[in-house]
Amino acid sequence: AAVVCEEVMKEPNSPVLGLHIEGPYLNPKMARSLFIEQVNTADPAAYRALLERVSCIRRWDASPEMPGALDFARYLTAQGVLASLSHTEVEYEDVKAAYAAGFTHAAHFYNAMPGFHKRREYKYEGTVESVFLIDPMTVEVIADGRHLPATILRLVYKLKGVERTCLVTDCMPCAGCANPQLDDLRLIIEDGVCKLADHSSLVGSIAMMDDLVRTMVQQAG
């Protein structure tokens, strides 16, 4: 895919501005919707070889807690590639370390990451609160009206502001279709969103960018 993207970007007036990679260095516990079942160590030989071969990669998402992920983020940053934390369950100290290593953005904020929680009788901040506490960190939200309720969209807008919040569709290939359908039997389209067939998780939106802008203006503005 990276090689194909590289070639497409060479074409005159190419609509492709760059490649965004999500995975494979993701926490399996938090990446069920991507069907990642094993721990994938961020192998310098593998990611350096790819980044030396192509120049189209603009962003790469990973879970900071995966083996080798912090060095991975440092390398991405040195290469001018945005390192984004995703599908993670890290708490404040680890988020601080991740930010220092180069993870300056949070992918599909609130989704595939925990918020405030308890372990036995004690309470702990989640990834969400940790990202809020690091002021320079940017976030993106899937504002399709399904992935996050209006109250959370308003909270993100209030705490991160317009300069540090962006919208992302995180959409499936059938987005925008009059009758969206998928061939993968593990997935279903229901209530205007894509879900795992067992209803244990959302998988992605079927919204277009204008839908997201409309939702933010009407519900979070």
Predicted regions and their residues:
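Conserved beta-strand segments that form the floor/walls of ligand-binding pockets within enzyme
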Residues: 20, 105, 195
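Divalent-metal coordination cores built from histidine and acidic residues
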Residues: 1-56
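A generic structural motif
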Residues: 17, 88-90, 166-172
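Catalytic cores of large soluble enzymes that bind and process phosphate-bearing ligands
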Residues: 39-42, 144-148, 201-208
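Glycine-rich beta-alpha junction loops
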Residues: 23-25, 110-114, 143-147, 169-175
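Histidine/acidic residue-rich metal-binding segments in metalloenzymes
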Residues: 3, 39-139, 147-165, 186, ...
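His/Asp/Glu-enriched, well-ordered alpha-helical/loop segment
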Residues: 123-141, 157-169, 174-221
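Glycine-rich, flexible loop/turn motifs
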Residues: 30, 35, 105-109, 183, ...
